Amino acid sequence: MKYKHIVFDIDGTLIDTEYAVINSLIKTITEITGRTPQYESLKFALGITGRNALELLKIPDIEDALKRWDRNMKLLQHTIQPFQGIKECLQSLLSRSYILGIVTSKTYQEYYSDFEPLGLADYFSTIVCADDTDEHKPQAAPLVAYLAKAHVSPENALYIGDSIYDIQCANNAGVDSGLVLWSNNVSNPIRADYYFKTPNDISKIL
C-alpha cells in the first residue's frame, strides 16, 4: 500500500463540533464586548487555533477570552458526537494495518476535554496538538512535527481534513491530502488529492 500513516484532523472530520464551537464563541464575544456576532461570520474560526481566532477578532485579553470560551464550550459538550460511520472507518483502516494519527489545532487541554471522552482516542498512535508547534495550520509545522514524531516520510502519509487550512498544511508539508465532504465548512472548491463523501469512502478508496 502507498501510505503507512493515515492522519486525521479532528473538528469537522472525526467529530461534529461546529455547533458547540461557534455558539460558545458567540457567547464568549457577547460576554466580553456586549455585541452578538452572526453565526456565519465566525465560521472562519473552524480549523484554526482558538488563540488565532481570537486574535483575528481583535479580542483584547486573549487569556481571559480563552478561559471563557473553554467554559462556554463545556456547556455544549453534550452536542459533540463522532460523525456517523467514523468508528467503523477507523476500525477498517486498522484491520488493514494502517497506522492512524491526529494533527489538530486543538490544544491538549481541548483534546482531552472535547475528544477523548468520545471513545475514539485509542485508535490513534501519534497525536500532534497546537501546543507542539509555534506555527499552526495552514503552515507545514504541525504535519512536519507529526512526521518527525512518528518517524515517517511525507510520501508515506496521507492527511485527511475538512478545511482549506488542512489541505494547505498538507501541501506545505509535502504530504498527500484528502478532503472530507460530510461537514459544511467548504464553501469554495478546494483542490485535494482525494475527496471523501462519507467515512466509508476512505476505506473504499485507499
Range-by-range predicted roles:
Residues 1-6, 94, 107-108, 112-206:
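Asp-based, Mg2+/Mn2+-dependent phosphohydrolase catalytic module
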Residues 2-89, 96:
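N-terminal helical cap/lid subdomain that shapes the substrate entry/recognition surface
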Residues 13, 104-106:
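Conserved phosphate-coupling serine/threonine residues in phosphotransfer and NTP-handling enzymes
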Residues 20, 45, 81-85, 106, ...:
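Short beta->alpha linker loops
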